[in-house]
């Protein structure tokens, strides 16, 4: 079994904002990574598809507040930006 990808290194090129914001994005990205790994056995964001992030945002977070879901959406957009797939979200 391979070692999970280091999210801090993975997101280092797209993380902006204050230190607290960066830490929140990293924490949330690791939570997303763990949930997607548990559901689909994909711990590497390079193998993720849009359906994985949509599942996380709609199903995994369905019992969370709107504010929580909003902040996770921001983190998901950062992940998608890092993957170079932003155009897929627009279509």
Per-region residue spans from a language model:
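Short terminal alpha-helical segments
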Residues: 1-21
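Non-catalytic DNA-binding core/recognition domains of DNA-processing enzymes
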Residues: 15-88
């Amino acid at each position: 079994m391979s070692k999970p990808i280091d999210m801090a290194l993975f997101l280092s090129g797209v993380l902006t904002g204050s230190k607290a914001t960066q830490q929140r994005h990293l924490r949330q990205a690791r939570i997303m990574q763990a949930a997607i790994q548990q559901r689909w056995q994909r711990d590497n964001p390079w193998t993720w598809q849009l359906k994985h992030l949509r599942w996380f945002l709609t199903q995994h977070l369905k019992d969370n507040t709107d504010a929580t879901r909003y902040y996770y959406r921001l983190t998901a957009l950062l992940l998608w930006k890092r993957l170079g797939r932003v155009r897929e979200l627009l279509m």
